[in-house]
Amino acid sequence: MAGHNKWSKVKHIKAKEDAKKSKIFTKHVRAIMTAARQGGGNPDTNAALRLAVERAKADSMPMQNIQRAIDKATGNLDGVTLSEVSYEGYGPGGVAIMVECLTDNKNRTVAEIRHAFKKAGGSLGTSGSVAWMFEKKGIVVVNRSDKDDEVMETAIESGAEDIKELNEVLVIETAPEDFNNVLEAVNNIDGIEILESNVQLVATNESEVDDETAEKVEKLIEVLEELDDVQNVIHNMA
């Protein structure tokens, strides 16, 4: 009996580890697909894709999974036709939320997203209802280190618009057209770690909410991010 209990515990731990790995792989797939859609499927000429692939490999993601994500994003997967579509709405507390998707069935996708908003006490809006609160920016997130000054100087010289110095990371913001130049320049600095790099929507003004509402919004974002068709969820919660 003790042996059975021990095996049950091992299976439970393995299941948790598998779920964790699956979540990590899903995150990598989304990053790879976003980069490939934005800059093409060749890592040699697409710095964001090259970094996304390197991060996936570092987490032991199989190369066939990586290539499938690239092929899916660039329309090179037989029998699969994907469309980019964005949905927008209000979460708890009136927080504006944008949901970027890649789907082969818009009816299924919008039904799943509408259900998630409704269950959270929010509402899916019409096109343009919250999009005006966001703008496209290139974002490069770098781990802080003794190279911070060099990173910031290089980023500014190569076209960065703004740099936020947070506790553990530097967040570099660029115009979309300057993103690749800035990313390439920063990535050439030895001994730094780029955690995230893509062109994404950024809130132009933030919405303040209390802790209880913030928890509800975070739960909605988590539910949305678990949907297969969802690529990115962007909000304006402070």
Swiss-Prot record:
UniProt keywords (A-Z) are: Cytoplasm, DNA-binding, Transcription, Transcription regulation
Q: Which domain of life is it from?
A: Bacteria
Q: Which Pfam families match?
A: TACO1_YebC_N (PF20772), Transcrip_reg (PF01709)
Any GO BP annotation: regulation of DNA-templated transcription
- Which Gene Ontology cellular component terms are annotated? cytosol
> Could you tell me which HAMAP family the record lists for this protein?
Transcrip_reg_TACO1
The record's family statement is: Belongs to the TACO1 family.
What is the protein named?
Probable transcriptional regulatory protein NAMH_0626
Supply the source organism for this entry: Nautilia profundicola (strain ATCC BAA-1463 / DSM 18972 / AmH)
